[in-house]
Amino acid sequence: MLIAYKYRLYPNKEQQEYFAKCFGCVRFIYNRMLSDKIDYYNETKQKLNNTPAQYKKEFPWLKEVDSLALANAQMNLQTAYNNFFKRPEVGFPKFKSKKNHKYSYTTNNQGGNIYVSDRYIKLPKIGLIRVKKHRDFDGLIKSVTISQNPSGKYFVSVLVNQEDKEKFCQRKAEILILQNRN
């Protein structure tokens, strides 16, 4: 069962600059890929399957941010396309505006590169960031979404894969039994 936990972040100036860079790069890659898909379809009447990696040669500053954030922007665009073709009333994907002051990006947990302690969260390419953790959770972190609201406050939403309580308790008991045998 997937459950999300939202916490307040307290990044320093350097981390705030990195987040601003990530927000901008995610918006840029989404808009650029959408524009290229539209142009390619108008010329050839075929779908274009492009990836963020193809743009890193042309725009080297994209290498400065988390590659999984860019990959998630690609997945969001693909989801918007699929929704449009399945249900046209949803509408064609729209370009992301700079004027929208709700910024966010999502990154995935790969090999434990994201973890949460009592006072900090570790994120890829940026390291430890102070967090106000008011609730604990058990389970495996799937992804995190960093967001900034219009007032400038930062938040992190941690998506956790939690097992059902019965399965979790049973598994925990099995682990304790195995540890006691050793």
Task: Locate the predicted segments by residue.
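Nucleic-acid substrate recognition interfaces
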Residues: 1-182
